Amino acid sequence: MKKVLLFAAIIICIRADEICIGYLSNNSTEKVDTIIESNVTVTSSVELVENEYTGSFCSIDGKAPISLGDCSFAGWILGNPMCDDLIGKTSWSYIVENQS
């Protein structure tokens, strides 16, 4: 059993340097409004790696991200015709939304 746990710990440490984007979070009493709920208690987050576009996005576990382009997340979910080219997308690792 100890060997299995040691092996699992080694694998986790080996994969730990493969972070593409990430956030550091800690406990907080901050409340925010989300699309579906109001006054949700969340952890505060600090952007760790990416704060500007470098020309390419990392795939995570072999899945490419989905870039919304000129479409907003809300427009994509609500069916804005501007987002029609995203209809066939069924699998992605994370969502990239451009600031506008």
Curated annotation (Swiss-Prot):
What PTM annotation applies here?
A: In natural infection, inactive HA is matured into HA1 and HA2 outside the cell by one or more trypsin-like, arginine-specific endoprotease secreted by the bronchial epithelial cells. One identified protease that may be involved in this process is secreted in lungs by club cells. Palmitoylated.
The family annotation for this protein states: Belongs to the influenza viruses hemagglutinin family.
Concerning Pfam families, the annotation shows: Hemagglutinin
Alphabetized InterPro entries for the sequence: Capsid_hemagglutn, Hemagglutn_HA1_a/b_dom_sf, Hemagglutn_influenz_A, Hemagglutn_influenz_A/B
- Organism equals Influenza A virus (strain A/Duck/Memphis/546/1976 H11N9)
GO cellular component term, pick one: membrane
Presence of keyword Membrane: yes
Job description of the protein: Binds to sialic acid-containing receptors on the cell surface, bringing about the attachment of the virus particle to the cell. This attachment induces virion internalization of about two third of the virus particles through clathrin-dependent endocytosis and about one third through a clathrin- and caveolin-independent pathway. Plays a major role in the determination of host range restriction and virulence. Class I viral fusion protein.
Write out the GO MF terms.
Answer: host cell surface receptor binding
Q: Does the keyword Cell membrane apply?
A: no
The record's annotation in Gene3D superfamilies points to:
3.90.209.20, Hemagglutinin Chain A, Domain 2
The record's misc note reads: Major glycoprotein, comprises over 80% of the envelope proteins present in virus particle.
Topology with regard to the membrane?
Answer: Single-pass type I membrane protein
Which protein, by its recorded name, is this? Hemagglutinin
User: What is the name of the gene encoding this protein?
Assistant: HA
Give an example GO biological process.
Answer: virion attachment to host cell
What are the boundaries of the signal sequence? 1-16
Name the glycosylated positions: 26-27, 39
| Cellular location(s) | Virion membrane; Host apical cell membrane
Q: What are the UniProt keywords, alphabetically?
A: Clathrin- and caveolin-independent endocytosis of virus by host, Clathrin-mediated endocytosis of virus by host, Disulfide bond, Fusion of virus membrane with host endosomal membrane, Fusion of virus membrane with host membrane, Glycoprotein, Hemagglutinin, Host cell membrane, Host membrane, Host-virus interaction, Lipoprotein, Membrane, Palmitate, Signal, Transmembrane, Viral attachment to host cell, Viral envelope protein, Viral penetration into host cytoplasm, Virion, Virus endocytosis by host, Virus entry into host cell
Determine the domain of life of the protein's source: Viruses
Assembly notes: Homotrimer of disulfide-linked HA1-HA2.
